[in-house]
Structure formats: C-alpha cells, structure tokens
C-alpha cells in the first residue's frame, strides 16, 4: 500500500505540494476534482497549465487516506435535489497542512476537466446537469448548459452577473409605442416661431415688437385732446407728440388708427350723432348767455335783407 502511494506521489512532479495556492478554508465545501484551478493534472505523470494542483479539503470520518485514494471518483451523482455545494464531497485527509492537496490515482483516467475554473455557486439548483458533463472526455453538448436570463455569468465570480442585458424586444416595443403615440388636436396647431431681434452695429438690440401698450391717464388725455382737434396727424406733429408723451412714433400712429376705427364704429351705432347734438346745444346755450349788448337779429330783417 505504501509503495503504491509513493508511486502516485513521485509521478506528480517536483511541485506537487505547493505553498497553499488557491486553497479553500477547511469548513468550506466545494468541488474536489471538478473545481480544480488552472494547475490541472492529466493522469500521465505530467502537470498541465501550471506548477500546482489544488484539491479538496477532507474531513476525517473514520475512513483512511489510502482507501480514499484507491476508490475511483464517481461524479455521476444527481445533486439537483439538494441545490447547494455538496458536489462530490470528500473527507479531509491527514495531510491538510500541505495546502489541502489531493493526489489523483490511475483509476481516475476517465476524468478530464473541461474548464480550469468552475464555480459551484453559479450552478444554483442545476448542479445535476453539470455533474457528468464536466468530468467526461470530449466536448459537451449545448443542451447540458442552462441559459441565463440576465446575461452571462462572470468567469471567476461567485454567482453574480457581470452584464444585465435587456432583451432587444423590449427596446423595439418601447420605440413602437413612442411612434404610435396618439396625436391630439392641440398638437396640430401651427405656432409661429419667435421673432428674432436684429442686433445693431454696437451690439444693442433693436426695439422689440410689443403687442399692447399700457398708456397712462396723462398720455390718454393728451392723445384724446389731440384727436379732438386733428383726426389725422402729419409726421412732424406725430414726432412732436411722441416726444412730449415719452412714446415712440409707431405707438402714436397705431393709437390714432385705433381711435379713428372706434369713432367710425360709434357713428354706425348711432352714439356719435348724440354727441354732436349735445355739442350743438351747448354751443347754443353759450350763445344765449353771452354778455354782448347788441341784440340778436330778427328773422324778418334777415329775410328782407336776403330779398
């Protein structure tokens, strides 16, 4: 028995027992042979991919180390019911001080590691589907691998996902919803673009077009007085009135145009003739109450002179 163990140890190379590289805690359970690091081993006495080989921690439960070595590993265990990392659990050997390493025997010729790094946490409840495919020689069919709904898992992660990809169908649906949005009537109203203000030579903005001007009481009184005497203003008079009332020429011109339209509207409605009669009556009363000493002309004398 000892010679067999010596044979298996001496054929593993000079760096079989390394300084605890890639080891796991004693309490942690993980894959003994399928979870090998990059320093994997092909059972022909040649290390592949590195100088060390990481194996599983073992716990002593009354089984000798030699018996464990002589027994072949059978990884075709259906662990889908358990759903955690009890995958191929072994017991701890007495040589746990040597980096928790485990030496493969010649009975393990059928085991070929498919990937150097294999995380059990990424498996979830689907451990049973990976048990045989990871230790079988040759390629593994795509049906053994489960698809991930939220992207591809990280190569050396612990169950986390590196990319949370959104399906392209949801993006296309959102774009179609935006394109098919209903168009309401108030969206069809044609709006005039804002008027651009021309900049003067020295960077001073020109006068903006003001829709409505709020005149003061004094300005309205002076404009009404000017309209009473002259319904139409010359350009010189318009400039003078605008300078007196602190307005521009355009404002005075527009006010007179609106005042004339209002006067025509009043005449059509019949309110303007009443105002004329009142003015005539008031002028007649002023003539009767005049202080002149000359008597008024009689109608007979007027008729005789006309003849």
UniProtKB/Swiss-Prot annotation:
Which region is the signal sequence?
none
**Which cellular component terms (GO) are annotated to the entry?**
nucleus
List localization entries: Nucleus
Location of region: Disordered = 159-178, 265-307
Under the heading SMART domains, the entry gives: HOX (SM00389)
Pfam families the record matches: Homeodomain (PF00046)
The entry's function note states: Sequence-specific transcription factor. Part of a developmental regulatory system that provides cells with specific positional identities on the anterior-posterior axis. Acts on the anterior body structures. Seems to act in the maintenance and/or generation of hindbrain segments.
InterPro entries assigned to the protein according to its UniProt record, in alphabetical order? HD, HD_metazoa, Homeobox_CS, Homeodomain-like_sf, HXA1/B1/D1
Q: Name one GO molecular function term.
A: sequence-specific DNA binding
**What's the protein name?**
Homeobox protein Hox-B1b
Name the family the entry cites. Belongs to the Antp homeobox family. Labial subfamily.
């Amino acid at each position: 028995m000892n010679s067999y163990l010596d044979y298996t140890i001496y054929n593993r190379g000079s760096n079989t027992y390394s300084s605890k590289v890639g080891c796991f805690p004693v309490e942690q359970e993980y894959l003994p042979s399928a979870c090998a690091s990059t320093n994997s081993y092909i059972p022909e006495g040649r290390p592949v991919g590195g100088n060390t080989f990481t194996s599983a921690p073992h716990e002593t439960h009354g089984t000798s180390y030699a018996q464990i070595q002589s027994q072949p590993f059978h990884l075709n265990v259906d662990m889908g019911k358990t759903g955690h990392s009890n995958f191929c659990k072994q017991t701890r050997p007495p040589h746990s001080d040597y980096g928790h390493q485990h030496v493969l025997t010649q009975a393990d010729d059928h085991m070929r590691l498919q990937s150097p790094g294999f995380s059990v946490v990424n498996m979830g409840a689907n451990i049973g589907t990976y048990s045989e495919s990871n230790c079988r020689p040759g390629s593994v069919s795509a049906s053994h691998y489960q698809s991930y709904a939220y992207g591809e898992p990280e190569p050396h992660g612990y169950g986390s996902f590196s990319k949370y990809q959104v399906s392209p169908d949801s993006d296309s649906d959102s774009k179609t919803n935006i394109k098919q949005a209903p168009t309401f009537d108030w969206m069809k109203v044609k709006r005039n673009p804002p008027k651009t203000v021309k900049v003067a030579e020295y960077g001073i903005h020109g006068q903006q077009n003001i829709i409505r001007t709020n005149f003061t009481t004094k300005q309205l009184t002076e404009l009404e007085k000017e309209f009473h005497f002259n319904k139409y203003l010359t350009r010189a008079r318009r400039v003078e009135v605008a300078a007196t009332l602190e307005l521009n020429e355009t404002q005075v011109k527009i006010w007179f145009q609106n005042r004339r339209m209002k006067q025509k509207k009043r005449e059509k409605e019949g309110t303007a003739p009443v105002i004329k009669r009142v003015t005539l009556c008031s002028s007649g009363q002023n003539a009767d109450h005049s202080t002149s000493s000359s008597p008024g002309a009689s109608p007979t004398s007027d008729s005789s002179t006309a003849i």
